[in-house]
Amino acid sequence: MSVADAMPETVDPGAASCPALFVAAPASGQGKTTVTAALARLHTRLGRRVRVFKCGPDFLDPQIHAVASGAPVHNVDLGMCGEADIARRLHAAAREADLILVEGVMGLYDGAPSGADIARRFGIPVDRKSVV
């Protein structure tokens, strides 16, 4: 499923499709920010346009990701931003980017909504082979 497939009806899906990956871990402090920033930097250096999103109301990690990707970073927080706003931002990113990275918060199944809930809601794949 692509990001465009998960858009609510209020968003015109248009022709937006882009590979996306949700970066998750079993708990906090496991290196999600480091891995996300490293992936963003690697793909940016390879000439790809990378857009990074951060789950939760975090304002420090997005600054790291903005430096790594060279692009603004937005939060994915349903309480703060709302589903329609997040969907619009993901859709806009899919139109202009070559890769979307979304960094989870805490463990994959921690919190309500959890990172797994967010990934499912917006159609962002989580590589289960990498999940420990």
For each feature predicted by the language model, list its residue ranges.
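ATP-dependent carboxylate-amine ligase catalytic core
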Residues: 5-125, 130-132
